[in-house]
């Protein structure tokens, strides 16, 4: 049977496609331009501030640069007397695109649906700011939550680090960094949604499912070169930090309970399957979902379809239990 999209996904995708497909990107900045145009089209809009309030904080990163950390919380959560679990969200975008502002609607939706405070880090983007900026900005934001837990009314023992796509890879790198730097208290939960983990990922050009990939090998190579450098990206013998490419980590011992999901038509499918296998090998508790017939960022390209609903239910269930 030929590889094909899930029928419901294919029908929904056809509704948002128009005209000729864009030419393959030639630079990381082209990816940023195209991604931001797509994000503005498919990401939900943030609700009014009386439904989900937004508060901005300033975090000092490893090099002294000030980073924006934005909280999304409902009035009910802000009135809570007991310290609340918190979600630190790291957006996707191939290391080269995405901002807290553009992703605000998705962050607000999580805060509204699960009734938890969501903190989104506006990490610096490659190629202007290559590794280690993104992961260090995210780690600094995690430290900020712990150091300011009392004034933020959050429980530092119940923090989930969540990311999707490149943000998922940065989330894994952040949690590895927290483990190795002996952050106390440790991260309670890791949620990596179709994470981008391995700069060495490579498929033969005739791999059948690649014709249905929404994030292609061309995108991937440009993104990794922007993030870790052209002289290192994709080269097995190059020295690439596991905080940048977590698939290169020697082990995952001591990582928190982890949620991972990915579609069968996602370029990251195989590296994510290997990540899950190694987590289990290192005795890390894992919940894993493999969604059939859908590619990268399927939930934004076809919102409301069954696999989007199933994925959202699974993710929200995990976040409510942090």
Residue ranges of model-derived segments:
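A glycine/proline-hinged amphipathic helix-loop "lid/cap" segment
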Residues: 1-74, 233-236, 321
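Short beta-strand-to-loop junctions in surface cap/lid or active-site-entrance loops
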Residues: 69-83, 247-252
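The conserved beta1-alpha1 loop
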Residues: 72, 90-93, 262-263
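Gly/Ala-rich beta-loop-alpha elbow adjacent to hydrolase catalytic centers
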Residues: 163, 167, 171
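Alpha/beta hydrolase fold serine-hydrolase catalytic domain that processes acyl esters and thioesters
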Residues: 156-158, 172-322
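Short amphipathic alpha-helix adjacent to the substrate-entry channel of hydrolases
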Residues: 101-120
């Amino acid at each position: 049977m030929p590889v094909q999209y899930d029928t419901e996904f294919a029908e929904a995708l056809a509704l948002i496609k128009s005209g000729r497909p864009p030419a393959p990107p030639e630079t990381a900045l082209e990816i940023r331009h195209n991604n931001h145009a797509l994000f503005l089209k498919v990401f939900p809009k943030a609700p009014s501030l009386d439904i989900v309030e937004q508060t901005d904080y300033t975090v000092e990163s490893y090099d002294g640069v000030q980073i924006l950390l934005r909280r999304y919380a409902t009035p009910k959560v802000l009135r809570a007397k007991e310290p609340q679990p918190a979600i630190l969200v790291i957006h996707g975008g191939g290391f080269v695109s995405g901002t807290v502002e553009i992703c605000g609607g998705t962050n607000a939706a999580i805060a509204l649906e699960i009734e938890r405070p969501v903190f989104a880090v506006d990490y610096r983007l490659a190629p202007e700011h290559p590794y280690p900026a993104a992961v260090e900005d995210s780690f600094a934001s995690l430290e900020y939550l712990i150091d300011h837990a009392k004034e933020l009314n959050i429980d530092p023992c119940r923090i989930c680090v969540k990311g999707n796509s490149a943000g998922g890879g940065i989330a894994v790198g952040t949690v590895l960094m927290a483990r190795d730097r002996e952050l106390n208290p440790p991260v309670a939960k890791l949620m990596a949604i179709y994470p981008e983990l391995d700069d060495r990922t490579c498929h033969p050009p005739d791999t059948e499912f690649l014709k249905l990939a929404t994030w292609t090998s061309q995108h991937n190579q440009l993104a990794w070169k922007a993030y870790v450098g052209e002289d290192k990206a994709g080269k097995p013998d190059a020295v690439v930090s596991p905080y940048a490419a977590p698939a290169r980590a020697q082990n995952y011992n001591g990582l928190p309970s982890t949620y991972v999901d990915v579609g069968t038509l996602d370029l990251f499918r195989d590296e994510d399957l290997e990540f899950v296998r190694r987590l289990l090998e290192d005795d890390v508790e894992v919940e894993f979902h493999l969604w059939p017939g859908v590619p990268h960022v399927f939930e934004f390209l076809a919102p409301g379809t069954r696999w989007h609903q199933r994925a959202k239910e699974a993710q929200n269930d995990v976040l409510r239990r942090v």
